[in-house]
């Protein structure tokens, strides 16, 4: 079936071949023939958009809820604030390492792209498999459910919100944000900018209220700030995990490196601006919480920010639950934006079906990857105990993040002459690797069963890799090839999408990338 069926003017776009065909026709609108625009994702993310993406993804629901977990395991205000500071410092070091990686390997995909470059396709595929199967859809489903709970809860003050209503609202939220990101990249970044400003303003309001209370002489909670502190290594590690949950998202911009304007400058600069802002906001917000709430209040609270507002905001206390919901909405938008690019890059490298590396011919958005991400998240919304699934990937997450930085050290040795616009002292990646090793080891001892389940999920990708990637396409069952070809062609026509110019001109044979 020829591309003329799409009815598009020059440049002409061709559909993928059927399974029994062996070539992909060239794009008649290639740069050599003077096409007005190349079929690639556009560089539309400015420095301000980048800061909003990082800040918006980091400030999700965690800072409104996680103080309870940190204080539970530290048992004192002083030690709790130290843990928050350590979590921020650790995240800054990790973000700096990723800034070097992102300016050296200017591909989207974050740790997937870096592991692929350093260690090859097999380990990179396992990283992609874990993200596809558990990490991204589970985290997005949880954020969407949290958003729905905070929106519906005011209507049911004396009981839990209806299960079905929460899940339907969560699904509507996911679908709406998917549509926004399919429509235009600018729509997604504008939504992100708006909701980032809203959540930062909400936290500033909490900080100001806390400072007012301090100035009024409410310092009793800090007079013996370390009294009752728990110095048990296991408790401290669990407290750090709770803090790091709130700091997660510092690698968001590395998922979309190819869409950043002047990434050699703006990627490290956006990270350098975002990380101090978030760390300072988190520490000051906790100071505000601890000024007003005693330890028992924090322990009994399901959402510390809401309890704080009830005691300080008076008739305006309703604004904080709304702020939490808006924070979740913005965080979900950033997660959808980033994870769709991960699947896009994975497909472009031959680790996922070709259809996921297509973009809309007019809007230049990865519509199939966004729809795939949406579908996976909706599936997990059906799972009643979806919150339990988050326990399965703590081990895998820190393993692959740490492995990315090990790859940074390896590439320093293997490819010393590569241009590196940002080159850190080796002190930073070495410290981060050591700390990541600790974060990988702790769950193995403190939460062995869930960690082993997480390892099992990762290893389930091994046969998938050998059957779907390593095995030559000609040796795969004809039935599967025909199904994939049909689904790809139908998706291409329904979504009005084509392969990017990189796929068409440099990978004409659509070869699978292997080691």
UniProtKB/Swiss-Prot annotation:
Top-level taxonomic group: Eukaryota
One GO molecular-function entry: L-arginine transmembrane transporter activity
GO terms under cellular component: plasma membrane
Subcellular location(s) of the protein: Cell membrane
Catalyzed reaction equations: L-lysine(out) + L-arginine(in) = L-lysine(in) + L-arginine(out); L-leucine(out) + L-arginine(in) + Na(+)(out) = L-leucine(in) + L-arginine(out) + Na(+)(in); L-glutamine(out) + L-arginine(in) + Na(+)(out) = L-glutamine(in) + L-arginine(out) + Na(+)(in); L-histidine(out) + L-arginine(in) + Na(+)(out) = L-histidine(in) + L-arginine(out) + Na(+)(in)
Signal sequence interval, chain numbering: none
Topological domains annotated Extracellular: 66-78, 136-167, 216-235, 288-311, 385, 446-451
Cytoplasmic domain ranges by topology: 1-44, 100-114, 189-194, 257-266, 333-363, 407-424, 473-515
PANTHER family: AMINO ACID TRANSPORTER, Y+L AMINO ACID TRANSPORTER 2
Job of this protein: Heterodimer with SLC3A2, that functions as an antiporter which operates as an efflux route by exporting cationic amino acids such as L-arginine from inside the cells in exchange with neutral amino acids like L-leucine, L-glutamine and isoleucine, plus sodium ions and may participate in nitric oxide synthesis. Also exchanges L-arginine with L-lysine in a sodium-independent manner. The transport mechanism is electroneutral and operates with a stoichiometry of 1:1.
Family: Belongs to the amino acid-polyamine-organocation (APC) superfamily. L-type amino acid transporter (LAT) (TC 2.A.3.8) family.
Protein name from the UniProt record: Y+L amino acid transporter 2
Organism, scientific name: Mus musculus (Mouse)
Gene: Slc7a6
